[in-house]
Amino acid sequence: LSYLAAEKNLADGKEDLALGGKTAANPGYLGTYNEYSGTKVGKLSAYNAGLLKFKEGKYQEAYDLLEKFSSKNKILMALKYGAMADCQINLNKNEDALSLLDKASSASDDPYTSYYFTRKAGLVSLALKKNAEAKKYFSAIDEKYQDYDNGMSDSYIEMVKYY
């Protein structure tokens, strides 16, 4: 019931109430996770709370909550790793972020999800001046995900030469 109340609060734009954890009457995602951490709903509550903490700019708290989430759903796991990577980027831990983006890009069989995180890993590699690694990611896009790319991977591969 507490998870459903948190979902309703989130749908109504009441993010603070959805996050909850401040009173027993409104446990929100945090309280639901704390009470039911070993269950699927508890783990999903940690994921949702992590996303809300990220939105608040509390990146370490968000990362810690996201880390507690697990699922057999491969797309959700890819999204988890991607969100954790965003936390690490905001904490200036770009090497860790790149590792998480690599995990995100291969966590799911969904082509768009894989494309999205492969592209992001390529861009982070470029920012870290890891041109060979960036080229690897952009070449993978060119080979596997042309339907989603609109020819941009060729531009990125060319950019690697001069960046």
Where are these regions (language model features)?
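Acidic, polar-rich low-complexity tracts and alpha-helical solenoid repeat scaffolds
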Residues: L1-Y163
